[in-house]
A protein has these predicted regions:
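ATP-binding N-lobe of GHMP and related small-molecule kinases
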Residues: 1-107, 125-130, 170-172, 180-183
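Residue-level signal for inorganic ion chemistry
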Residues: 14, 42-44, 74, 112, ...
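Short, basic/glycine-rich phosphate-binding loops at helix/coil junctions
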Residues: 52-67, 140, 215-226
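DPxDG-like acidic metal-binding loop motif
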Residues: 74, 107-135, 148-150
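Phosphate-handling active-site elements
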Residues: 83-96, 122-142, 270-283
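Short glycine/threonine-rich catalytic loop with a Thr-x-Gly-x-Asp
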Residues: 106-115, 253-262
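Conserved, helical-rich catalytic subdomain that frames metal- and/or nucleotide-binding sites
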Residues: 151-152, 156-254, 269-282, 291-295
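Short hydrophobic/aromatic beta-strand micro-patches
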Residues: 265-267
Length: 295
């Protein structure tokens, strides 16, 4: 048996702009995404020597915040990889995936996608055979955030359904505090509400933010952080707005919901101020899953 352990990092959406639903049922979007230090720890163990009735078994062992095994993106990643591995080699491999969850689920932080990408990376390192192009095709098939999580760079402009990526400069060194209320949000439900309500939304400034990233202008980056989904999600889960208000009151240069929610992130230039904001979230009159990390 061989083992590979990978840190699967969360992401935040610095901008998120949604367009009309396409004929295939998906929405076109445009988003500047950035990875952060918050991560799950994914350990993958493979066994190519088993010959008993459990040969080819895929098991997912997860600490918390996880759906049924076969609905789990990490499971689907292993299943897709192993099918291609068998097709190319004629060999059967068993796989155990152990996930130490730190990224909340249904939060807009890409936890499931990060785990999925980590499994694909680990299996490629352990078993080889699969090309980078084949791995990227599996990633795009499994989820719109997975291709970004698979990339080695930290920041990108995602367009189309989210799978077309353009590498961007990283943010200047700073700190991120996240707060996630217990009530999660279904991405599908939020897209349906977006279609139904056609919410009046902020003017998204992705081009201005990209220019600010290129110039390493921290203040202007923060001025152009915005999310079209946020008004809809605050209407559905009022705690999102309260977390955002707490982060801004604690000195965040910017605070915004990530993805389709329900996590909110705050950007801080100073570590001590970020840690103070983390503590402030703990005083809110409802449960908040919190993290503080570098960007």
């Amino acid at each position: 048996m061989e083992t590979c352990t990978i840190n699967a990092r969360a992401k935040i959406n610095l901008t998120l702009e949604i367009f009309d639903r396409r004929k295939d049922g998906y929405h076109d979007m445009r988003s500047v995404m950035h990875k952060i230090g918050l991560c799950d720890i994914v350990k993958v163990t493979v066994d190519t020597e088993r010959t008993d009735e459990n040969a080819g078994e895929i098991r997912v062992i997860c600490s918390k915040y996880v759906c049924a095994e076969k609905d789990n993106l990490a499971y689907k990643a292993a299943d897709s990889f192993m099918a291609l591995y068998y097709k190319k080699t004629g060999k059967i491999a068993s796989c155990i995936i152990e996930i130490e969850k730190n990224i909340p689920d249904k939060a807009g932080l890409g936890g499931g996608s990060a785990d999925c990408a980590a499994v694909l990376d680990a299996l490629t390192k352990l078993l080889g055979v699969i090309t980078e192009k084949e791995k990227e095709e599996i990633a795009a098939y499994l989820g719109s955030d997975v291709p970004f999580m698979l990339e080695k760079y930290d920041c990108a402009l995602a367009t189309g359904t989210g799978t077309t990526l353009q590498k961007l400069p990283m943010m200047p060194m700073c700190y991120c505090v996240t707060g996630t209320p217990d009530k999660g949000l279904s991405t599908r439900d939020i897209y349906d509400l977006f279609d139904e309500k056609k919410h009046v939304v902020p003017n998204v400034k992705a081009n201005s933010l990209i220019s600010a990233l290129e110039q390493e202008d921290f203040g202007r980056i923060c001025d152009n952080i915005v999310n079209q989904f946020e008004p809809i999600c605050i209407h559905e889960v009022s705690e999102i707005g309260k977390i955002k208000k707490c982060l801004l009151k604690s000195g965040a240069y910017a605070a915004q919901m990530s993805g389709s929610g329900s996590a909110v992130f705050g950007i801080f230039a100073d570590k001590e101020q970020a840690e103070a904001a983390y503590r402030a979230l703990g005083t809110l009159p409802f449960d908040v899953r919190r993290s503080v990390c570098k960007i």
